[in-house]
Curated annotation (Swiss-Prot):
PANTHER family: GLYCINE BETAINE/PROLINE BETAINE TRANSPORT SYSTEM ATP-BINDING PROTEIN PROV (PTHR43869), GLYCINE BETAINE_PROLINE BETAINE TRANSPORT SYSTEM ATP-BINDING PROTEIN PROV (PTHR43869:SF1). It comes from Ruegeria pomeroyi (strain ATCC 700808 / DSM 15171 / DSS-3) (Silicibacter pomeroyi). This is Trimethylamine N-oxide transport system ATP-binding protein TmoW. It is a peripheral membrane protein. The complex is probably composed of two ATP-binding proteins (TmoW), two transmembrane proteins (TmoV) and a solute-binding protein (TmoX). Induction: Expression is induced by TMAO. SMART domains: AAA (SM00382). ATP binds at residues 64-71. The keyword Cell division does not apply. InterPro entries: AAA+_ATPase, ABC_osmolyte_uptake_ATP-bind, ABC_transporter-like_ATP-bd, ABC_transporter-like_CS, Gly-betaine_transp_ATP-bd, P-loop_NTPase. Residues 32-268 form the ABC transporter domain. GO terms for biological process: glycine betaine transport. Keywords: ATP-binding, Cell inner membrane, Cell membrane, Membrane, Nucleotide-binding, Translocase, Transport. Its EC number is 7.6.2.9.
Amino acid sequence: MRFMGSPVISARNVWKIFGKDPVGYLKTLQPGRSFDDIRADGYIAGVRDVSLDVARGEMLVIMGLSGSGKSTLVRCFSRLHEITGGSIEVDGQIIGDLSEKDLIELRRNKMGMVFQSFGLLPHRTVLDNVAFPLEMRGQDRHTRRKRALEVIELVGLAGREDYFPRELSGGQQQRVGIARSLAIEPDIWFLDEPFSALDPLIRREMQDEFLRLQAMLGKTIVFITHDFDEALRLADRIAIMKDGAVEQCDTPDQIVMNPTTGYVAKFTEEIDKARVVHAGVLARAGVVGEGQPVEAGATVQQLARLLVNDSRDLIPVADKGQVIGALDRQGALDILLKAS
């Protein structure tokens, strides 16, 4: 999917260093110093020289192992952490220049946040938990109740408005957390490993629910996970982090097919590429195929029967009815056979 227009979030050369005098240290830091070099100097580089954009309506998944800097980076995006160097713009505003009042307004009106710990108020019902941020805004009881009921229905909890958190399953509690963050109708949605505490079946269910909501709402989303399969399933683009730096930021197809570092390649070794790679990525522009085209959005796995039974060497690929090129059937078969 291609996203047009100005980015909603734009980070340039962002650093977040922890230590005694991080600003002074960064001023004297020599180019090329590694994470371990910085640690040897008595500092921790939570984020190292990160530059990336998040487009409107895009779901950017930030992935990495524990300690890679993914949560620190997202906290910089919302200015829960003050950055040590560089700049971050949100909707065209340099957030480091905002007053405390303006920053609070930005968070209240444009940003929704969901974390691994649900953070529900145990003495409040589902309805009152979801309405809580609207109450903090000062909205009247009727207005906030109406909005809370809308998002409770949206996340599939209609009929449980009067339940208390202790009466809900883990997946249902996380749905309440998602509904609460949606109640303020945020433009930007930050989710920090929201499903990692759930068992695998509920986690898959919540991923399905999340994709359904995103298809309906089209939010700008920054989603953190340490699970590569989850990243591949949800992302428009994936940024893989290590030691505070972004190793590669690209579409799931490109990361699986063309990892740019050995570190990224390790994540892709056990991945069933046929499940991830789409015909549109394999299509060679300007190459002419014969016969009925396949859809650009179809994965190699979805095309398995055709690839095995078809006799064409070059198969046309169409995106929204327009032929964009042709894929080499043997190349696609190689991907399919390696997955089997």
